[in-house]
Amino acid sequence: MAKKVTGYIKLQIPAAKATPAPPVGPALGQHGVNIVQFTKEFNARTANQEGMIIPVVITVYADRSFSFITKTPPAAVLLKKACNLKSGSAAPNKTKVATIKKSEVQKIAELKMPDLNAANVETAISMISGTARSMGITVVED
């Protein structure tokens, strides 16, 4: 018989930098999860993605054990990294902060494909392009 699920915890944590300090510790502590064990496992699993923010969904079971799934980094983080930006535009409709080639957007879309609700790569490209526009990044043809 499967374990009884008591809750889900969704967090965005920098890769290989999970610590028992807030926000990770309190979120896990209130569900009775072994915080040190989670941080060690998360840091080991995300060691190759240094510098990225990794969304994680933690499933907590009745016996206080847990399992977790790491997702791909948010599209905004990938776009900022591709354009070497600290943050997007405060007024994206007025101030453009960068340009990105459609081929780079396609690479990001292919990377994000498992986590996107998109039927094909073209749809994923349009979703990532929309995120770029809302950040003040102009998408240009190759």
Swiss-Prot record:
Decide whether keyword Ribonucleoprotein is in the record: yes
* Recorded GO MF terms: large ribosomal subunit rRNA binding; structural constituent of ribosome
Database matches in Gene3D superfamilies: Ribosomal protein L11, C-terminal domain (1.10.10.250), Ribosomal protein L11/L12, N-terminal domain (3.30.1550.10)
* HAMAP family documented for this protein: Ribosomal_uL11
- Post-translational modification, briefly? One or more lysine residues are methylated.
Q: What family is this protein classified in?
A: Belongs to the universal ribosomal protein uL11 family.
- UniProt cross-references to SMART domains, sorted A to Z: RL11
Signal peptide extent = none
Q: Which GO terms describe its biological process?
A: translation
InterPro entries linked to this entry: Ribosomal_uL11, Ribosomal_uL11_bac-typ, Ribosomal_uL11_C, Ribosomal_uL11_C_sf, Ribosomal_uL11_N, Ribosomal_uL11_N_sf
Q: Which GO terms describe its cellular component?
A: cytosolic large ribosomal subunit
Entry keywords, A to Z:
Methylation, Ribonucleoprotein, Ribosomal protein, RNA-binding, rRNA-binding
Please give the subunit comment from the record. Answer: Part of the ribosomal stalk of the 50S ribosomal subunit. Interacts with L10 and the large rRNA to form the base of the stalk. L10 forms an elongated spine to which L12 dimers bind in a sequential fashion forming a multimeric L10(L12)X complex.
Function summary: Forms part of the ribosomal stalk which helps the ribosome interact with GTP-bound translation factors.
- The answer, when asked if Ribosomal protein is one of the entry's keywords, is yes
Task: Report the protein name in the record.
Answer: Large ribosomal subunit protein uL11
The organism's place on the tree of life at top rank: Bacteria
Pfam entry (one): Ribosomal_L11
